[in-house]
A protein has these predicted regions:
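Loop-helix junctions at membrane interfaces
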Residues: 1-176
Length: 176
């Protein structure tokens, strides 16, 4: 598909917003265990305005910024977001890249395709925006926290000094 100059500039502007948010306390909110984020918001907006491919690009930029942030200013759970802090070798590197980049790409892809679906169904635009924004935020939360649970439950338990059986409850507590 041919992309015109306006599209490329729009993606670049949204990417600049993602990078700005990812490198300020407005986007990456430092908590004792993990970094909360608002960076997914421009990814969702970009996916709605520019489509799923732009959403994927913006999500990848968000993920790379997250990877860099967790490498340069680590928290207790940064091993789950940075391949350079992996505790389980090459497998841990791949898992960390999935959590930091892959999950964030999915925000843009799913939000973009959901918006396209709503447009094809001729759904109420206002309600569609609310639902797409909510789903995009939940994709971020569920994919990231779910992947941490599925891929790093043992390391999470060790980092928090709790039993592995308590990890699900702790992750759900972080989500809520």
């Amino acid at each position: 598909m041919k992309k015109d100059t306006r599209y490329l500039v729009s993606v670049a502007l949204m990417a600049a917003i993602v990078i700005l948010l990812a490198n300020t306390p407005l986007g990456m909110i430092q908590l004792p265990i993990i970094k909360a984020t608002t960076v997914h918001i421009p990814v969702i907006i970009g996916a709605i305005l520019l489509g799923p491919s732009a959403g994927a690009i913006l999500g990848a930029i968000f993920g790379i910024c997250s990877l860099i942030s967790n490498t340069t200013a680590p928290t207790l759970l940064s091993f789950a977001f940075s391949p350079f802090l992996s505790t389980t070798g090459l497998v841990g590197v791949v898992k960390a890249i999935w959590i930091s980049v892959g999950c964030r790409i999915m925000i843009g892809v799913i939000s973009g395709w959901l918006w396209i679906l709503f447009r094809k169904l001729k759904a109420n635009s206002y309600l569609s925006l609310i639902i797409t924004g909510f789903v995009g935020s939940m994709v971020n939360t569920i994919f990231v926290m779910g992947s941490i649970y599925l891929l790093f439950a043992g390391q999470y338990a060790a980092a928090k000094d709790v039993a592995r059986t308590a990890v699900f409850g702790l992750i759900m507590g972080t989500v809520t």
